[in-house]
C-alpha cells in the first residue's frame, strides 16, 4: 500500500471512530498517558493557584436571562445523563461542577462532557492502565506538580474536574487555541487523529443551543 493510500485509510478510520463516539453513549475509557512536561515556575504557580482555589462549584449570573439559560441547560443535560447516573441529586451535583469548572477556565461544557465520556465513561473511580484517575483521567503526577501531592484526591468529583479543566486549558494555551492538538496532548497522543475525533464525536451528544 502506498503512503498516500495509508494516509487515506488512517483518516477514514479516524472519521469512523469519531462517528462511533457519537452513537455509543458510554464507552470504555480511552485514556492515554499524558507526558510529564517541565513547567516554568510562573506557570506552575498559576496552575497551582487555579486548582487550590476552594470556591464551591456554584455558578453566579449577572442577569435572570443568563440564569434561565443555565437552568434549561441543566435540565436538558440531566435528562441525557440519566441512563448513567440514575440519582437526580448526583446528576445535578456533577453537572453543576462541570458547568462551573469548564466556564471558569473558558471551556465549553459540551467539550468537557465529551472528553469525560471518552476518557472514563462517566465513571468516578476509573483508573487507566497508565494510572490516570477519575472522570477526566488525570495523571497522578499532576497532584505533585500543582496540587498538594495527594493523588487519592483525584477521585473526588470537584477536584478531578478542576484538575482536568485546568490542565485542558493549559494545553489549549500551549497549542494556541488548536483544539485538535490540545486533545492529542491531553491524551498523550499529540498529532494523531483517533482521540480528538472520538472527543469531537462524543461532544455532539452534549451540544446545547439555548432557545
Enumerate the predicted regions with their spans.
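General helical secondary-structure elements
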Residues: 7-9, 26-29, 87, 199
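N-terminal secretory signal peptides
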Residues: 1-10, 17-25
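Short, surface-exposed loop and linker segments with low hydrophobicity and enrichment for Pro/Ser/Thr
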Residues: 4-8, 12-13, 99, 107-109
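Small/flexible residues
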Residues: 14-15, 187
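Catalytic glycan-binding domains that act on GlcNAc-containing polysaccharides
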Residues: 33, 51-211
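Cleaved targeting-peptide boundary
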Residues: 31-39
Amino acid at each position: 500500500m502506498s503512503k498516500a493510500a495509508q494516509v487515506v485509510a488512517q483518516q477514514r478510520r479516524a472519521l469512523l471512530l469519531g462517528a462511533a463516539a457519537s452513537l455509543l453513549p458510554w464507552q470504555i475509557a480511552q485514556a492515554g498517558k499524558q507526558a510529564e512536561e517541565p513547567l516554568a515556575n510562573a506557570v506552575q504557580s498559576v496552575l497551582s493557584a487555579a486548582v487550590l482555589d476552594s470556591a464551591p462549584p456554584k455558578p453566579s449570573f449577572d442577569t435572570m436571562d443568563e440564569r434561565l439559560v443555565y437552568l434549561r441547560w441543566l435540565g436538558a443535560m440531566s435528562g441525557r445523563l440519566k441512563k448513567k447516573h440514575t440519582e437526580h441529586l448526583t446528576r445535578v451535583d456533577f453537572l453543576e461542577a462541570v458547568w462551573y469548572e469548564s466556564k471558569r477556565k473558558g471551556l465549553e461544557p459540551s467539550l468537557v462532557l465529551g472528553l469525560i465520556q471518552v476518557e472514563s465513561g462517566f465513571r468516578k473511580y476509573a483508573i487507566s492502565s497508565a494510572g490516570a484517575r477519575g472522570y477526566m483521567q488525570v495523571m497522578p503526577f499532576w497532584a505533585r506538580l500543582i496540587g498538594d501531592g495527594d493523588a487519592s484526591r483525584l477521585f473526588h468529583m470537584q477536584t478531578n474536574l478542576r484538575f482536568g479543566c485546568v490542565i485542558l486549558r493549559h494545553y489549549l494555551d500551549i497549542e494556541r487555541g488548536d483544539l485538535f492538538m490540545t486533545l492529542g496532548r491531553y491524551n498523550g497522543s499529540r498529532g494523531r487523529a483517533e482521540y480528538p475525533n472520538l472527543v469531537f464525536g462524543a461532544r455532539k451528544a452534549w451540544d446545547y443551543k439555548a432557545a
